[in-house]
Regions:
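Alpha-helical structural signal
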Residues: 7, 11, 34, 89-92
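Active-site metal-binding core of divalent-cation-utilizing nuclease and nuclease-like domains
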Residues: 26, 31-73, 81-82, 112-125
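Nucleic-acid nuclease catalytic cores
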Residues: 79-127
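Interdomain/boundary linker segments immediately adjacent to catalytic/signaling cores
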Residues: 1-20
Length: 127
C-alpha cells in the first residue's frame, strides 16, 4: 500500500468513528477505537510506538511516542482539543523527520465536522 492509500483508509475510519461517537471523548478512546477499526480492515499498526532520537551522534531511545504508526508508513497523531495550533502541525512534522516517514495525519476529534479536524502533514515539501 502507498502512503496515500493508507491515509485514505485512516481518514475513512476517522469519519466513521466521529459519526458514531461524536466529539468530546478522551484521546485515548479515539486512539483505541481507531486502532481496532484499522486492524479489522487488515492494516498493520503500532500504538504508542517509541521513536528514537539521534542528536550529535548520541541515540536516545525515547525521543517521543507516536500515537499510531500504520503500515510502517503513516504516523497518526490524535487530539481531542478545542483548536489545533500551528505548533501541533510542526510537532508532527518533527516526528515525521525523526522517524524518516513522509506522511502524517493530525486528527482532532473534538470538532463539529471531522473534515475540519484532519490535517495532512508531508515531510519533504518546501515551506
Amino acid at each position: 500500500m502507498t502512503e496515500n492509500s493508507v491515509a485514505k483508509e485512516i481518514v475513512d475510519v476517522a469519519y466513521r468513528i466521529h459519526t458514531v461517537l461524536g466529539p468530546g471523548l478522551f484521546e485515548s478512546v479515539y486512539e483505541a477505537v481507531l486502532a481496532s477499526e484499522l486492524q479489522k480492515r487488515g492494516l498493520q499498526l503500532a500504538r504508542q510506538q517509541p521513536i528514537p532520537v539521534v542528536c550529535e551522534g548520541t541515540r536516545f531511545e525515547m525521543g517521543f511516542r507516536a500515537d499510531l504508526v500504520v503500515e510502517d508508513k503513516v504516523i497518526v497523531e490524535i487530539k481531542s482539543i478545542a483548536e489545533i495550533a500551528a505548533l501541533h502541525k510542526k510537532q508532527l512534522l518533527t516526528y515525521l523527520r525523526l522517524a524518516d516517514k513522509r506522511l502524517g495525519l493530525l486528527i482532532n476529534f473534538n470538532v463539529v465536522l471531522i473534515k475540519d479536524g484532519i490535517s495532512r502533514i508531508v515531510n519533504g515539501l518546501q515551506e
